[in-house]
């Protein structure tokens, strides 16, 4: 009811939840009926839990491989579910830290690009000098570009620039940019039901980032108006 009330005030596009928790499947059904997309994340769900949630309307996996049940030969968990299922879309942090280079290659080899959504999960301290920082009141430390919680040492988010993630995947997989670029905007827009976004074509919002051959940002356009030039 709380989410329904919030959705009536301002449209909710996506909710991340642990599908193994009591009431989660019923929540997914009601949220989906209200036009809210549901994603599994921060979860210890089994493959059976995943299947129940997907039948109820689950469409995403949140920052794939991170904070979710791992792949095991007797229980494939959410990581295995993401590889096995051909419909579920997965969010992926392409920094070779949250997923190592070999895992990135494995995922992009076994999943269709149409089901991939590159994200950064970046912090406010992204691309700042190494040192202390903050994550919602939790102290973090950034060392060699890797952000970790000071207390536990767990990854606290990334310091990834979006274009660098695209560059990393392109060079690791050899996949053409014309294919990979779908995972940077088009897939996300389609999954969230955002019309007129994610493609350079007549009738679409002219929000564009131009990159050079080394993936450095050259120009940024918002609504067709140049807002940045290197």
Predicted regions and their residues:
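Short, Lys/Arg- and Gly-enriched loop/turn segments at beta-strand edges
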Residues: 215-221
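His/Asp/Glu-enriched, well-ordered alpha-helical/loop segment
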Residues: 77-92, 96, 108-120, 126-204, ...
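Active-site core of metal-dependent hydrolases
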Residues: 2-128
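Alpha-helical scaffold segments that flank or form the walls of functional sites
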Residues: 1-8, 179-181, 185
């Amino acid at each position: 009811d709380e989410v329904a009330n919030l959705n009536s005030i301002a449209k909710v596009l996506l909710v991340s939840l642990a599908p193994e928790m009591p009431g989660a499947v019923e929540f997914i059904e009601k949220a989906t009926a209200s036009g809210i997309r549901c994603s599994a994340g921060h979860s210890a769900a089994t493959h059976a839990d995943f299947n129940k949630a997907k039948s109820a309307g689950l469409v995403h996996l949140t920052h794939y491989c991170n904070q979710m049940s791992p792949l095991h030969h007797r229980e494939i968990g959410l990581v295995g579910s993401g590889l096995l299922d051909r419909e579920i879309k997965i969010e992926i942090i392409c920094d070779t830290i949250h997923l190592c280079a070999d895992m990135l290659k494995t995922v992009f080899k076994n999943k269709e690009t149409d089901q991939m959504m590159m994200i950064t999960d970046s912090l406010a301290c992204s691309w700042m000098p190494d040192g202390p920082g903050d994550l919602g009141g939790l102290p973090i430390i950034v060392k060699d570009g890797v952000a970790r919680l000071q207390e536990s040492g767990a990854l606290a988010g990334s310091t990834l620039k979006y274009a660098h993630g695209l560059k990393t995947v392109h060079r690791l997989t050899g996949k053409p940019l014309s294919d990979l670029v779908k995972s940077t905007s088009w897939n996300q827009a389609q999954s969230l039901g955002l019309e007129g976004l994610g493609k350079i074509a007549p009738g679409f919002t002219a929000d564009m980032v131009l990159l050079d051959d080394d993936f450095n940002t050259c120009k940024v356009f918002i609504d067709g108006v140049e807002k940045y030039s290197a």
